[in-house]
Regions:
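Acidic, PIN/NYN-like endoribonuclease modules and their adjacent C-terminal/linker elements
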Residues: 1-2, 89, 93-121
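Short, well-structured N-terminal submotif of metal-dependent ribonuclease cores
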Residues: 1-30, 40-53, 121
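Amphipathic alpha-helical segments within well-ordered protein domains
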Residues: 36-39, 53-56, 73
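Alpha-helix/helix-capping structural signal
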Residues: 8-9, 33-36, 67, 105
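Short loop->beta-strand "edge-of-pocket" segments that line small-molecule binding or catalytic clefts
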Residues: 3, 27-29, 57-58, 62, ...
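Active-site neighborhoods of divalent-metal-dependent phosphate/nucleic-acid chemistry enzymes
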Residues: 14, 60-102
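Nucleotide phosphate-binding site architecture
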Residues: 10-11, 39, 108, 116
Length: 121
């Protein structure tokens, strides 16, 4: 099963090892938006940046293409979500993946978006 993971899931993984025992049948993906969010923290120690880069090097990262951009624009016409969330949601929809997030409230009103608050067992 392919699953797009939100930035907050990666942060929770860094803090608590959330993804350490993930079933190998789950293929985890990250939006390029989440990559940006992870790398933008000001004052990040070199060790933290190295840890993030190591994680990113083994993670499948999905770029924004025209179909994702158009889907994000379409969603954004009728909703007040922040642009990064629109791109993450649009990526999940266009790639036909559920979005694993702790910020369900930010995404729950988006049609055709399958949300996961935890990984299936």
């Amino acid at each position: 099963m392919n699953i797009l993971i939100d930035t907050n899931i990666v942060i929770e993984h860094f803090q608590k090892g959330l993804l350490s025992d993930t079933d190998p049948e789950f293929h985890l993906y990250l939006s390029v938006i989440s990559e940006t969010e992870l790398l933008r923290f000001a004052g990040m120690a070199q060790i933290e940046e190295t840890f993030i880069n190591d994680f990113l090097s083994i993670t499948r990262i999905l770029s924004i293409d025209s179909s994702v951009a158009r889907r994000a624009a379409s969603i954004g016409r009728t909703r007040s979500n922040k642009l990064p969330d629109l791109f993450i949601a649009a990526t999940a929809i266009e790639w036909n993946m559920p979005l694993f997030t702790r910020n369900v409230k930010d995404f729950k009103s988006i049609p055709n978006l399958n949300l996961l608050e935890s990984l299936p067992e």
